[in-house]
Amino acid sequence: MKYEYVETFGSAVQKHSERLVVSEPSGEGGQRTKRQVPALHLDHLLIGSRGVSISSDALELCCERGIPVTIVDRRGKPVGKFTAPAIHGTSRTRRAQIRAYENGLGVTFARSVVIGKAANQAINLKYFAKNRRERSPDQYETLRKSAEAIDRVARRAKKISANCIDEVRQPLMVLEAEASRIYWSSLSALYGSSSGFVHREQRGTKNPVNAALNYAYGVLTGEVWTACLLAGLEPYAGFLHADRPGRLSFVLDLIEEFRPVVADRVVFALAAKGWRIEQEENGWLSLASKNKLLASLAERLDSPEPDRGRRRKLRNVIQRQAYAAAQHFLGNETYVPYKQRW
């Protein structure tokens, strides 16, 4: 998977034949560096700064080649997306998704999201524990017990049912929060001394691991957003996450089972290898750290994983789950969350 990330103020993205040409300021005297990116080899264009321009010809090329263009803020959070109209699917799926809010299918989906996220959090802890069984039995036992506790939370979620999501959103969110508390507490105990990761922080964090997690979640949000559009789903009509103006509620629903699988795995694997996360004064990741993280996320998304009897790249698993959600709302199949192997 190939990301092209453009952040430097004053940069420009233009088209030349079947290539994107990225021109960036380089030092004094008005000098610029240029690099050419074949559209054939590009999966996603990320623009991460104010002061970056892109030509209409470049946008047209991206549309023709199915390359989403996502504008992200300095934390990696998507603030806008440019895609071709042809990828947005049919209105039939969107209508079914809206009806699912009050016909029980929305409850089934939201419950599956909570179960899937908890299962993958537990699997992550088992994954991190397996290499510690001999060299650190205390850590191994702590992680094993935490994973079992999260699995118990997932089993409790299976018992929740109703016809309208409004009736069960709060109980589901409470269980999701309980599983996450166990998960992050365990990871803090595991990595806190080496990375300063004490607890999960979102906005305004100065902690390097949290800053990396936030950025990774932002990139993953862009991937899931695109998958939702391709499946004909409405990104703003969520179930577990309540509607709010401008909030990608359904994208936030679907992303939950993939946070541990993609973002957490990558960030903590890098931390375990001694990655020195560079930050700017405001806590944002440096450009070098963003590029390192993007490369690792792309590698993870391209890794083949077992899924329903075959091996698929993780980014294809995400797309498969978006299609499965669409079929669920249409009444053709029951949504089953993706659970990673360890």
Language model features with spans:
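Core catalytic machinery and nucleic-acid-binding channels of phosphodiester-processing enzymes
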Residues: 85
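Active-site helix-to-loop segments that bind/position phosphate- or nucleotide-bearing substrates
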Residues: 1-25, 64, 88-342
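Extracellular/luminal Protease-associated
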Residues: 37-53
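Active-site-flanking structural segment that lines cofactor/substrate pockets
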Residues: 21-40
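Short, glycine-/Ser/Thr-/acidic-enriched flexible segments
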Residues: 18-20, 27, 51-53, 76
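Short gly/pro/ser/thr-enriched loop/turn and capping motifs at secondary-structure boundaries
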Residues: 75-81
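A short acidic, amphipathic alpha-helical/loop segment
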Residues: 57-61
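Short hydrophobic alpha-helical runs that function as membrane-insertion/retention elements
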Residues: 46-48, 67-73
